[in-house]
Amino acid sequence: MSGIRPVDGRANLTSAQNLLSTGEAEERINWVSKALCRATDPDELFVRGAAQRKAAVICRHCPVMQECGADALDNKVEFGVWGGMTERQRRALLKQHPEVVSWSDYFEKRKRRSVG
């Protein structure tokens, strides 16, 4: 998962803006604790190039794949495999849908359309 490290050791505006509310933090802890990759060596998920597709295999049956992908897209996480998506796949989605404010909402709407 990502973290913010101020260069000079002091908190900055960016880090303050990225703090989660208590409810958001609890929600995130809830889904992260269910992730299949939680016990995986992070080095296996933060690989480059074609190795990312191989790394994404663990995501296929993950019960929180949608939440993970939405979190990575909402936070514009640049590196690693998240929600079964490679870096390139996430960049493409962000470029194709710059209007999306909440990727969780976007995925839910898309899921409802495909079911109904």
UniProtKB/Swiss-Prot annotation:
PROSITE patterns: 4FE4S_WBL (PS51674). Keywords: 4Fe-4S, Cytoplasm, Disulfide bond, DNA-binding, Iron, Iron-sulfur, Metal-binding, Transcription, Transcription regulation. [4Fe-4S] cluster binds at C37, C59, C62, C68. The keyword Disulfide bond applies. It is found in: Cytoplasm. One of its GO terms (molecular function) is protein-disulfide reductase [NAD(P)H] activity. Binds 1 [4Fe-4S] cluster per subunit. Following nitrosylation of the [4Fe-4S] cluster binds 1 [4Fe-8(NO)] cluster per subunit. Disruption phenotype: Has a rough-dry colony morphology. About 50% lipooligosaccharide (LOS) biosynthesis, with LOS-III and LOS-IV being most affected. Decreased expression of a number of genes involved in LOS synthesis, such as mmar_2326, mmar_2327, mmar_2354 and papA3 (mmar_2355). Residues 36-92 form the 4Fe-4S Wbl-type domain. Pfam families: Whib. InterPro entries: 4FE4S_WBL (IPR034768), Whib (IPR003482). HAMAP family: WhiB (MF_01479). Belongs to the WhiB family. Acts as a transcriptional regulator. Probably redox-responsive. The apo- but not holo-form probably binds DNA. Plays a role in lipooligosaccharide (LOS) biosynthesis by regulating LOS gene expression. PANTHER family: TRANSCRIPTIONAL REGULATOR WHIB4 (PTHR38839:SF7), TRANSCRIPTIONAL REGULATOR WHID-RELATED (PTHR38839). This is Transcriptional regulator WhiB4. It comes from Mycobacterium marinum (strain ATCC BAA-535 / M).
